[in-house]
Every structure is written in structure tokens, then in C-alpha cells.
Amino acid sequence: MSETNKYLTIMNKQKNGKALHLEHAAEEICFESLTVKDQEKLQEFGINPSSIPEEVYSIDCSSLNRVWHGIGMRNVHGGVEFISLTEMKRPTTIHRKGITLQPSKKGSVASCCLFSNFMDYLAYLSLSKDGKIALPKECDCIILNHHFNLSHFLVESEEYEEVNLFLPNSSAGKVLTRTIMDRNPAAVDWS
């Protein structure tokens, strides 16, 4: 791919190998169903593979003259939240930043859960599946992915009667929690 061609090529093998082009990035990304090897790696992190939704993919991408392998999810702006389980400590965004929304399978619901990143979300799903957590099972899950996305979440959260916050206990996580709780009386901190 030439430097003048500023497109992100997404090759989704599940959709007949058709390529989608997203402007303003020079990366190539290949999506496929989560591989057994990636499921085993997630299990090493304590995540139950049977709890992982189909929206989580095994991903290969090229960047900086290197091919990276990891897992990821798409966000609402078409970007990809990506982590290399062997080489990264936390997920990063490829292309456009945005929240990731996982709506409840029951349709419209009155509660949501907010997570800092998709690895926290996967841990929550694993704990729920194993019966170790008894919070709302039927709720929309929103993954913030980056503190820049806070304003987008604040708008989204106004639609819910109950907002469950699962944010880090870091100083940034505490500021996010306090900001959300000040703006939304329905917010409950579970960190």
C-alpha cells in the first residue's frame, strides 16, 4: 500500500472477503473469528472463552513496517479497539476513537454498565458467566475506550434509569467516576 493512499483496508473474512476502505489511515487490518489460540491466551488472563461475544475478533494488522496480532472490537465510529495480548498492557485504538456499544439482547433496557476498555468488559462477562457477579444481566454495555469519549457517554447515559460504573481505581478513573456521578444521579460506582 503506497504512502499516498491514506486508507485503512479492512478485510473481513466473514463477509466474503470484501474490503472496506476507511479514510485517513495507512494500516491494513484483517478480521476473523476468534481463534482457538487467542481463546487460550484469554483464558490465561482469567477470561472464560465461552463468555466472549462474537463481536470480538482475532485481528492481524500492519503498522510501522510490522505485522501485529491480537484481538479487538469495532467502536461506533468504525475504528478498532485493539490489543496484542503478548506485547501490550492495554488496548489502543486504530483509526477513529469512539465508544463501543454492546446492546442488550433483550432490546431496549433501563440500565447500562460502563467499562474503561474492552478487556475490563470481557472480564465482567467472564465473571457474570461464572456466577461470581450478580449485577444486571440484561443491560446495555458501553465501553469508553478513552477519556476523550466521556462527552459521548454522558449524552448516551441520560437515556438510562440506572448506570453502573466499572472504572479503574486510578486517579484518572476516580476523576471520570466523580464527573459522571456529578452529572448523572442514576450512576452507581462499583469499582
Show where each model-derived region lies:
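Terminal peptide-recognition signature
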Residues: 42, 124, 165
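Basic, glycine-enriched DNA-binding surface that flanks or lies within the catalytic cores of DNA
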Residues: 3-97
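TOPRIM fold recognition
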Residues: 130-191
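Phosphate-handling DNA/RNA-contact segment within nucleic-acid enzymes
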Residues: 62-156
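Generic alpha-helical secondary structure signal
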Residues: 2, 36-40, 148-151, 174
